């Protein structure tokens, strides 16, 4: 048996964190049973005997080091599960936020509410596909013009398609585009219970693009757009073999990698815990319980290998995804036609509403440039009613 020796304070902090999680979620008995079965299954504390309890006690007396290792393993697994629950687990909810649920800052809410009302009045068609790993995926399709370009807009972490994609939907609708608003896995009407920060979502984005090409034909241009984790999703998708009619990507406030954003955010969710062991345990939880590794994807690497032009947008007052991450993604990108827009003073995921004039102009120019590169003439002009 391989036993990894770690400092005592590491185990104590793990046990404390595990206890807090179980107490808060009121799942102590179920979790103890779950981890007991997991440990036995893994052979950490495996004793096969008809008189199981007596054998456990006997083993504990005869093998104190094995017992200590089992206790430490339980604590680590418990902490791993706790961090997984906090950071990556989510039950999909079909509730749709009202305009009153928009960001609390009044300056943004006033600008977003009219667009939210317009989206709520727009007619959509529900669309369902199955991801490559069998997860059911759902989306809303808004048809505006036959033969128009299609914008597929991905929302962020624990977000809503009709909220995070609101700016993109509004802009693209004014341009006459058709719009597809997918629910990311573990969100909305899509299946799954694990948010993988783009690791698996990138393949979902490709699956939606493949569906769109099959449904609308290869002659219809497709744009992949995303905000926050949605931006990371489309950036990571840029590193895949996308359909040839995907002609542009818009990444609004995307991070550099699932690993880096997880390391950045964990201290905010779990103050007082050392980052190194906390991230290591959180990564273990993602692998064991979420079946993904945060280190299996890198947005900068995907951007560097993208064959599709990318428009990067980032607010320099972003407190969630650092502005420097957006700049790094842009700097490594080698795709022709790439652009970067700094929205001064914009907080996280509100650049479109913070400076609508600049955002609308720059994004519209980028989209039109992508269409021109593909020799696709779309008659709609840039919207002139920017706020």
Region spans (language model):
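Short alpha-helix in the alpha/beta-hydrolase fold that links the catalytic acid
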Residues: 308, 322-331
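The serine-hydrolase catalytic nucleophile loop
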Residues: 157-171
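An N-terminal hydrophobic leader/cap segment in hydrolases
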Residues: 67-129
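Conserved alpha/beta-hydrolase
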Residues: 172-191
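Short beta-strand/loop motif that positions the catalytic acidic residue
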Residues: 305-306, 312-314, 318
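Catalytic histidine-centered segment of alpha/beta-hydrolase-like enzymes
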Residues: 346-357
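Hydrolase active-site cap/lid region
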Residues: 236-292, 301-302
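Catalytic nucleophile-loop/oxyanion-hole region of alpha/beta-hydrolase
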Residues: 161, 187-218
């Amino acid at each position: 048996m391989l036993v990894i020796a770690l400092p005592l304070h590491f185990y104590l902090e793990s046990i404390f964190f595990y206890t807090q999680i179980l107490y808060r979620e009121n799942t102590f008995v179920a979790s103890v049973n779950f981890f007991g079965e997991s440990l036995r299954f893994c052979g950490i504390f495996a004793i096969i005997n008809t008189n199981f309890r007596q054998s456990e006690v006997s083993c504990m007396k005869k093998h104190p080091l094995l017992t200590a290792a089992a206790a430490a393993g339980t604590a680590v697994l418990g902490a791993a599960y706790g961090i997984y629950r906090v950071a990556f687990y989510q039950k999909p909810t079909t509730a749709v936020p009202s305009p009153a649920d928009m960001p609390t800052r009044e300056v943004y809410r006033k600008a977003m509410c009219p667009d939210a009302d317009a989206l709520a009045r727009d007619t959509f068609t529900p669309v369902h596909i199955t991801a490559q790993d069998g997860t059911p995926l759902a989306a809303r399709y808004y048809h505006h013009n036959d033969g128009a370009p299609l914008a597929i807009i991905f929302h962020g972490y624990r977000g809503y398609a009709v909220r995070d994609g609101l700016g993109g939907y509004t802009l693209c609708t004014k341009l006459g585009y058709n719009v597809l608003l997918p629910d990311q896995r573990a969100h909305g009407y899509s299946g799954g219970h694990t948010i993988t920060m783009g690791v698996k979502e990138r393949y979902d984005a490709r699956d939606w693009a493949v569906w769109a090409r099959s449904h609308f034909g290869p002659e219809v241009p497709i744009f992949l757009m995303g905000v926050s984790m949605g931006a990371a999703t489309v950036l990571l998708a840029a590193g895949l073999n996308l359909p040839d009619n995907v002609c542009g990507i818009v990444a609004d406030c995307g991070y550099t990698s699932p690993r880096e954003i997880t390391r950045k955010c964990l201290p905010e969710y779990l103050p007082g815990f050392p980052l190194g062991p906390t991230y290591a345990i959180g990564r273990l939880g993602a692998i064991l319980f979420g079946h993904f590794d945060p280190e299996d994807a890198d947005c900068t690497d995907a951007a560097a290998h993208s064959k599709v032009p990318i428009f990067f947008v980032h607010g320099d007052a972003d407190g969630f995804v650092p502005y420097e991450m957006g700049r790094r993604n842009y700097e490594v990108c080698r795709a022709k036609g790439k652009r970067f827009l700094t929205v001064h003073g914009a907080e996280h995921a509100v650049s479109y509403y913070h400076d609508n004039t600049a955002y609308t102009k720059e994004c519209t120019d980028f989209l039109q440039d992508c269409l021109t590169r593909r020799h696709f003439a779309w008659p709609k002009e840039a919207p002139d009613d920017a706020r």
